[in-house]
Amino acid sequence: MVIWTDPAKADLHHIFEYITHDSHHYAKKVVQEIADKTGVLHELPHIGRPVPEIGDDSVRELSLYTYRIIYEISGRDIYILAVAHKRRDLKAQDITR
């Protein structure tokens, strides 16, 4: 099962709020595409690449537009940990696991 953590939900909300300043339609589209992209993870959990800043193969990422969708594989569950802009200087301590 794919489970969105509270920090990841907050990231998605902030992305929506930021984009909506320019286009409400595009903001909805981007957020929906991010959600859709995570939908395949329950069947293909290893589709993403390991996150180099974390150094743990169970923490992986998918890329969409300018965003990194960071998730952790834990048994049969997939936890969406964060959705971060690619330009962000991401550090291991920025990801709540």
Describe the residue ranges of each PLM region.
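Arg/Lys-rich, positively charged N-terminal/basic patches that mediate binding to nucleic acids
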Residues: 1-31
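Short alpha-helical functional segments enriched in proximate histidine and acidic residues
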Residues: 15-18, 37-41
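Generic structural signal for secondary-structure transition and capping sites
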Residues: 24, 39, 43-46, 67, ...
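A short, surface-exposed loop/turn module that caps and links secondary-structure elements
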Residues: 38-63
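Enriched for short, Lys/Arg-rich terminal
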Residues: 64, 72-97
